[in-house]
Amino acid sequence: METRSRKRAEATSAAPSSSSSSPPPPPSASGPTTRSKRARLSSSSSSSLAPTPPSSSTTTRSRSSRSAAAAAPMDTSTDSSGFRRGGRGNRGNNNDNSDKGKEKEHDVRIRERERERDRAREQLNMDAAAAAARSADEDDDNDSEDGNGGFMHPNMSSASSALQGLLRKLGAGLDDLLPSSGIGSASSSHLNGRMKKILSGLRAEGEEGKQVEALTQLCEMLSIGTEDSLSTFSVDSFVPVLVGLLNHESNPDIMLLAARALTHLCDVLPSSCAAVVHYGAVSCLVARLLTIEYMDLAEQSLQALKKISQEHPTACLRAGALMAVLSYLDFFSTGVQRVALSTAANMCKKLPSDASDYVMEAVPLLTNLLQYHDSKVLEYASICLTRIAEAFAPYPEKLDELCNHGLVTQAASLISTSNSGGGQASLSVSTYTGLIRLLSTCASGSPLGFRTLLLLGISSILKDILLGSGVSANASVSPALSRPADQIYEIVNLANELLPPLPEGVISLPTSTNALVKGSCQKKSSPSTSGKQEDILKISPREKLLGDQPELLQQFGLDLLPVLVQIYGSSVNGTIRHKCLSVIGKLMYFSSSEMIQSLIGDTNISSFLAGVLAWKDPQVLVPALQVAEILMEKLPETFSKVFVREGVVHAVDQLVLVGKPSHASPTDKDNDCVPGSARSRRYRRRSSNANSDGNQSEEPKNPASLTIGANHNSLDTPTASFMLRETVSSCAKAFKDKYFPSDGGDVDVGVTDDLLHLKNLCTKLTAGIDDHKVKGKGKSKASGPFLGDFSASKEEYLIGVISEILGEISKGDGVSTFEFIGSGVVAALLNYFSCGYFSKEKISELNLPKLRQEGLRRFKAFLEVALPFDGNEGKVPPMTVLIQKLQNALSSLERFPVVLSHPSRSLSGSARLSSGLSALAHPLKLRLCRASGEKTLRDYSSNIVLIDPLASLAAVEEFLWPRVQRSESALKPAAPIGNTEPGTLPSGAGVSSPSSSTPASTTRRHSSRSRSAINIGDTSKKDPVHEKGTSSSKGKGKGVMKPAQADKGPQTRSNAQKRAVLDKDTQMKPASGDSSSEDEELEISPVDIDDALVIEEDDISDDEDDDNEDVLDDSLPMCTPDKVHDVKLADSVDDDGLATSGRQMNPASGGTSGAAAARASDSIDTGIGNSYGSRGALSFAAAAMAGLGAASGRGIRGSRDLHGRTLNRSSDEPSKLIFTAAGKQLSRHLTIYQAVQRQLMLDEDDDDRFGGSDLVSSDGSRFNDIYTIMYQRPDSQVNRLSVGGASSTTPSKSTKSATTNSSVESQSHRASLLDSILQGELPCDLEKSNSTYNVLALLRVLEGLNQLCPRLRAQTLSDRFAEGKITSLDDLSTTAAKVPLDEFVNSKLTPKLARQIQDALALCSGSLPSWCYQLTRACPFLFPFQTRRQYFYSTAFGLSRALNRLQQQQGADGSGSTNEREMRIGRLQRQKVRVSRNRILDSAAKVMEMYSSQKAVLEVEYFGEVGTGLGPTLEFYTLLSHDLQKASLGMWRSSSGDKVSMQIGRDEIEDGKPSAANRDIVLAPLGLFPRPWPSTADISEGGQFHKVIEYFRLLGRVMAKALQDGRLLDVPLSTAFYKLILGQELDLHDIVLFDAELGKTLQELRVVVARKHYLEGVGGDNSSTISDLCLRGCRIEDLSLEFTLPGYPEYILRSGDEIVDITNLEEYISLVVDATVKRGVTRQIEAFRSGFNQVFDITSLQIFTPSELDYLLCGRRELWEVETLAEHIKFDHGYNAKSPAIINLLEIMGELTADQQRAFCQFVTGAPRLPPGGLAVLNPKLTIVRKHSSTSSAAANGAGASETADDDLPSVMTCANYLKLPPYSTKEIMYKKLLYAINEGQGSFDLS
């Protein structure tokens, strides 16, 4: 309905001339002589047939208005398009709010008619003569004038229509003075005649045949009509007749057709619903439903009621329609049941005060439907009940009646996680949230509901829900799978409603501004006395229940208190935090002392309060103090000590100082969201829109910023801020004086004995380190490296102190977070690990080797203490405790901001994404001004360009250059009409005056060009850009204009296009006149459009429906979805693709191709962390979003215009123009949106920006602003690196960065861990002054030690063997315990990052805060894999894929956006190729050579097969993976001829042909690793090694493309290979990862060498002992080792025939290691990396570990569990979860072996593995449907369905992950048929 209405409205607004411009004759027309009279009657809403309902006059008048508006010329005034838009919006309003909407619509139409009258009067003056002449000559053959009228035709018809509209407004039939245009009048008269004929047929009583025929014709006319074509339809004539026929009970056909006609009428003319209701149709339809004599009539009546209920729900309700639609629900099909429930939901939308009379009897029916099997019916039923409950919320007795029907029990069961595997298996997010809201309503308003919920154990249900939401206990749960913020809010709100309200004044909860101020400590009595007074006065039923059954309250607290504290700490939503505090406050107030004592055993409430008080959020400071006061009242002895230890007292001390002016600023700086008092004028101006934490709609008046509350008039002033500080300070002082009075200025009231002891230990450690460092320096000057006795003893002393520190931290009650932070432990340990150099002078290269040795010794010593060898199983290692303390400290100290664009703040979930995407659908208005002093270019500032926000500045340059260059050829586009060339206008010349051009020519020009767009900066796509001149100044000076807020209505891109030439450039500078915006709009004169800009389009609306367009992607002309590129190979065996590839690239150097170099230039060097300067907000965008050239698809890489010409030059071609804004140079790779946002951010100070100040204003009007960018020619003065930090890298640097930076910089990423520890630095540009810097640095050290633990442990054992403490080599293989990776995940930062990267506008503008990039780069372990993966997908592949990923994420939650324009924003371009199945490898080489560097998604088909889409594509990657593992390629190491199958994911199916082809597969039990090739290998083209290099380059491209497109590979790469990919260096210890035998032998040989060195160093004559050293009883010489690489005799390590002995054993080991993991594989790895970098930057993978990278690339390997299978599989089309066939299938799937599971996945999805996350994240979802028998004769022979099905095989649709399963009779037959289909169905795609 809504879509159809919208399209009709668009069709109306786009019509060049109106077919409905004639006045609407009423249906009672009898002849032409009465036309004037009928017009008068129509305008006064009178009818000769029947009384007209009151709303009909509005309807008729609006129809007339619409006719006039449609006739008005679309391109001559803003008002016409604005009027159409308003009409459309009003209709949407009517659907939601009939009465109120109609009043608003009436007012709007009155104003529009006044504007129209003025407009028509102007046109009357201009064209009266021409219009009169035209009207005299006009006749019914007007069609012929179309070709002869030229430009004059549309203008004359427009003028005529406008005159008619004016005369019609004047009334008295004067509109007949001008006849309508021929087409309109002819069609109207024909239509009128037909309507009269139909009406007479309907009235032919007694002639049922005529009536049936007339009804049939009427239904046909209404079904194909539009609102405009039926504008003359007389509702008041037809509806009474139709209602009468609806009661024609003797003829069911007549009743059915009458009901159908009414349905069509309400659909096509929504305004007619009022008349339908007025004439009593609703009661007739209800009667037809209740009798249910004819099923088709009942269904049609339902459809009609659904349409009517959308406009008039109350009328339907009063007519008894609610019970009517629900009474006989079981008789209808599922589809009709959904219609019935949808109708019921409409009727419950706005219930009147007496609704209970109509609703209550339906409640039992609706409650029973909550158990219904259909999810849509269930959803509508829950909506009905939620709306009923909300309507009855003020009436407890009515709510009790609701709850009496079992509503609460049913709803609680539905939301329970135990009910349906996570609670949302069958419920959408909105339904689930609605049910929780329903329970909240019942709990708050109904004593019975409250009691029922508590007795049901609702607290444990809520606990399970929240623990599964990823915000609490398990921080590793994917944010993508966590619940939306609004749902979490509702859950916490339900918990809040389950506790009685607090007595007034006890706790000032943050619900309103006044509560904070009035609830001061001085006015409040103590909780105990206050409670007693309340008890005496009145005890509510809730309090009585909790008093009678205190165990209910205790269980509530035990269940929810720990979860609420965790949610408060991890949520980035202010409203949720405030609600959590409300629940905690109530819980503390109503709990007894004994209860609180039991609660604090599981929850550290003191630490929580300390954190809240330190957070400095004014909305919660007073309530937190009051909660602390309650605790001190109830348990003074306990909390008087704990508050000191946990830092509550310290935080209160700081708050006392807040009231003093000198201490005001720290309060504002520390907040996580919005700094509060130090506000710039700009922020205060916009603070009414500021809402930093995404507050929910439930409390929209309460922004979670430091400008508290909703009353912006009062609290947004310095006075209010001062009052607030005074209130907080006085409360804190009162609390401190009452409970912690200070004695004579003693400042150490918060210092405990534990803290003093810890401080002393840290002082000893630091002193010892410094002393050691000084002595070491002196010693080293004399004797170089020192290993003297004093050093060893000093190390022992230091490690002893560290052991004491760890013991103090790990002891029983432990050290509080406050004490830990204040003790100096972090700095002392960092100083120890960095050998005294932390945060001190730089370490010279000369001293580095010595310090490395010392650092390694300290690491080993520390691990022995922190992670002991013989750690007790039950005891937590000290290192784990230390990490936990550090995590608590980090959560307490961090203040990293979540900077949200405005649409993302007030919304959540799909609404948040939808708002961001809809904002991006608006074009931005750009004024391009010549820079002052620039004389060589023309000025273009008199034009306004409408441009796609995601177009790049490079595209703007291509568009602008021919229009501003001074060459003669460029200055001669088509001659402008009636105006001068914009570039030659005098500085002060304006074009807004009507006299600046002749009206006729200007109007004519616009009529011909109104729907035109230009293509700018995109490839094979159209970006709507309009250009116009205005009267405003040229915008010189400030880079970004801040205009006044103009038109604030909703605006789609098509609307913007239609009104582009009509918009006014408003600026903050006052205009020359004081006219209102409406007056200014009316005075605008149309301006010229440059002919060179225009590309003719038939209709702008076509742009919206063009599926081949993609707004974001840089698809090349070849990437058209309709074409499939057949990749054909030469017949010769020579690898065509590889040869081509080799000729274009230097295979040995790792250099990139031209495309890769361009990509490297496109991606702004990620090695430069501060490329945007120290401000940082955009530095992340530069680094992670690759400059957004690649991101938006409009960078310099490969963009072409419509004709395929390259728009963007290669990186070594200089720019023709440079752009600046606010004096700062802008990179060509920035998008327009980025450039605009960058200026908005630079215009504010850091506090405003990081405070989450608005990036886009709440009403979207920021897109109506006009932004100014200056342009000038590059010259020697300005063509420098970016002044403003836009990171405009030079071409030479960019080209180099493709090879040097991507490999060298990343090589040092992990290899420099030790050096970065010694230097005491994080590998990012986080300021060292940041309070979290040291904590992050120490966490990084500990995480590195945890990863290196096995290696360091092995070195320790090696040292012991060398010293003779260990004699057996078998003892070297001891496994080392490690700290679980989950311990390193921070539960507070994880949801922050997850929330930040869900902000579509922040991603597009590159305005993610710098900490996102800094922390993911330096400390990726802080975030779980799922969050890092989402961050990776959001930043590595560009904007289109990031937005597409967000949409998929929302769609997976069942709440994805369905708006077509928004979907186009994130739609990906696809490139289809067809390849030969028999030559996969060669085809892949060619395909990747052509398409890997493009952004289009690759889809593969096969010659001679019908399969297309996802399945064949996945199989292509799988087959290619297998081909790349062939031993004949010479790429991989192979284990010696044993037949061991690979353990890591590659067990082949023994199914005939595949197994034969797989005999050549490399055997690599531990994963694939490159085969070493000597440096002397022939690199020339055609040689074997050259091919190997090209295969690795191909592998790099394939792997990157698979990651980019979300495909899975089946390549079992070894962990060591992944480490090389990630830029980590390998050494001897890594060889065991891919060759266990060789690695173990080399390690044992290394231990022998260590023993030799030890014997040489102890002194004495040990030569004989050394020569006798043995390896497992065998002398080295007897091993017969030669200087060749083991397994590769052709690889010569050293020339000569020397045998390896004990003297040269060390050299031999070094050479073998070098050949195996370094020099022998370097060129292969470089080729791989260069191929990878052609697709996207390989350094973006460094946030993953090797095992995670394998998981990301190759998917999941876990075995299925039967219990979880049903939750992640969809059953449809004949099956449900209880079907016997489904039960059998799930059992079979659970019993499959690992090999059979791989085969099953390959069969169903096309890939042998599932994506990361398994079946749960498979997209599309695995769906099982019933397959009907292929034999039709079976039924005729009497065979049963199951017997027939037993002969069939299952089949699949891999594109949709569909398994078509016949209903087999037994499980055994199903198992047999399934395996047969799996084994025989491989290798082709045919129709099933």
Swiss-Prot record:
The active site is at 1855 (glycyl thioester intermediate). Residues 1-10, 97-124, 1019-1029 have a biased composition (Basic and acidic residues). Widely expressed. CDD domains: HECTc. Pathway: Protein modification; protein ubiquitination. SMART domains: ARM (SM00185), HECTc (SM00119). The keyword Metal-binding does not apply. Residues 137-146, 1076-1113 have a biased composition (Acidic residues). ARM repeats lie at residues 227-267, 270-310, 312-349, 351-390. GO terms for biological process: DNA endoreduplication; proteasome-mediated ubiquitin-dependent protein catabolic process; protein polyubiquitination; trichome branching. Residues 41-81, 986-1002, 1148-1157, 1286-1303 have a biased composition (Low complexity). Residues 1-157, 660-711, 970-1119, 1134-1157, 1280-1307 are annotated as: Disordered. Residues 1490-1888 form the HECT domain. GO terms for cellular component: plasma membrane. Residues 1377-1451 are annotated as: K-box. GO terms for molecular function: ubiquitin protein ligase activity; ubiquitin-protein transferase activity. It catalyses: S-ubiquitinyl-[E2 ubiquitin-conjugating enzyme]-L-cysteine + [acceptor protein]-L-lysine = [E2 ubiquitin-conjugating enzyme]-L-cysteine + N(6)-ubiquitinyl-[acceptor protein]-L-lysine. It comes from the Eukaryota. SUPFAM superfamilies: ARM repeat, Hect, E3 ligase catalytic domain. It is an enzyme of class 2 (transferase). Its EC number is 2.3.2.26. Keywords: Repeat, Transferase, Ubl conjugation pathway. Probable E3 ubiquitin-protein ligase which mediates ubiquitination and subsequent proteasomal degradation of target proteins. Involved in the repression of endoreduplication process and the cell morphogenesis in the trichomes. Belongs to the UPL family. K-HECT subfamily. This is E3 ubiquitin-protein ligase UPL3. The gene is UPL3.
